[in-house]
Amino acid sequence: MKIKSIKAITLSMPFNHGGKKVIFHGKEWKSLEFNIVKVETDKGITGWGEAFGYTSWKSVKIAIEDMVAPLLIGKDMADIPKLLLTLQKSLHLFGRYGITMFAISGVEIALWDALGKEKNKPIHELLGKKNNDLFKAYSSLFRYGDPKIIEQKCKQSLDDGYQAIKLHEIENDCIEAGREGTGNLPLMLDTNCPWTYEETLSKKEFLKKMKLTWLEEPVYPPEDYETLAKLKKELEIPIACGENACTEFEFKLMINQEAVSYVQPSVIKVGGIYEMFKIIKFAETNNISVMPHTAYFGPGFLATLQLAALMQRDTYIERFYLDIDQEFYPNFKKAINGKFKLPSGPGLGIDFDYNKLSKYEI
């Protein structure tokens, strides 16, 4: 089966997070931009992927169509790992992180979806043995900066069936509100790289009091694995990291430096499904659990479920807790009894209805 065409489709989806106005990269943040990748084959099969977008969507879209697609059109797709390696080698001079890898990731996911459909098998069956099809989920909250809203959103998440919550707060009163709203259930904290080593260490007693399941990316830069390794020992709190890392190579550095308790690869950033599959294997061989970063609503979310099915160690699936105008997969809007179930269809498992999404195309 050969690749006939590759197209990047950008959707701008209004959302509601239930809080105050948010400024993101200098603008009011009112919509999410999704870069959806459509691959068509010579057998008439369509595969769907997702590349990281947000405010970088224009650059990623150009990279998909002008850098990645020309290297793949007409190629046989029986050996996707080989194609992935060819892409990475051909494009490495443009960087091994960021726009280039986001573009590769989206296309690679679409290739696996198409291949799975051609073979009438879900992606996880093309890669290995399924170990699980039901995954614990957590509600990943917006950064609100308001203790009252945070406590309310935590309680709302629990009412919706989630049994674990992640905050994106940095102020003590906001973190305390999250713990109050979550009760004794698991609470994670993603700070998005705001602090120095000294600032993080100064918060040790407070953070320990919060009984965090993990502390995520406390320091800048996120690739300062030497500092993370020190904090992992000194804080006595599990450290998680990885949403800002790309390729198996960078995760090997992270793990070999004993920087983390949990790794958090993002399938729409790291290089796609096979790259993340290699990361999972390496992490689990080194007794590190994978807690995938998946604050996404499109094919990237389903790709994560396909990979989670192959994990031998326990995991959590992240769900960005906000309402978008039109769900890609309505059955996955909320966790059922705190869990998500792996879809059973070929490829990614299910297809979205593009007719319902097309009005958001830009």
Residue ranges and their predicted role:
Residues 47, 137-140, 163-167, 187-191, ...:
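Hydrophobic faces of well-ordered beta-strands that scaffold small-molecule active sites
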Residues 6, 40-118:
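Metal- or metallocofactor-binding catalytic centers and their adjacent structured scaffolds
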Residues 125-235:
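Metal-dependent enolase-superfamily TIM-barrel catalytic cores that perform enediolate-based chemistry
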Residues 348-362:
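Extended hydrophobic packing segments that form well-structured cores
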Residues 3, 44, 68, 107, ...:
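Conserved, mostly hydrophobic/aromatic
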Residues 66, 205, 211, 219-339, ...:
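Shared catalytic-loop signature of beta/alpha-barrel
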Residues 1-43, 52, 322, 326:
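Structured beta-strand/loop patches that form or line metal/cofactor-binding pockets in enzymes
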Residues 35-47, 332-334, 340-343:
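Active-site and channel-lining beta-strand-loop segments
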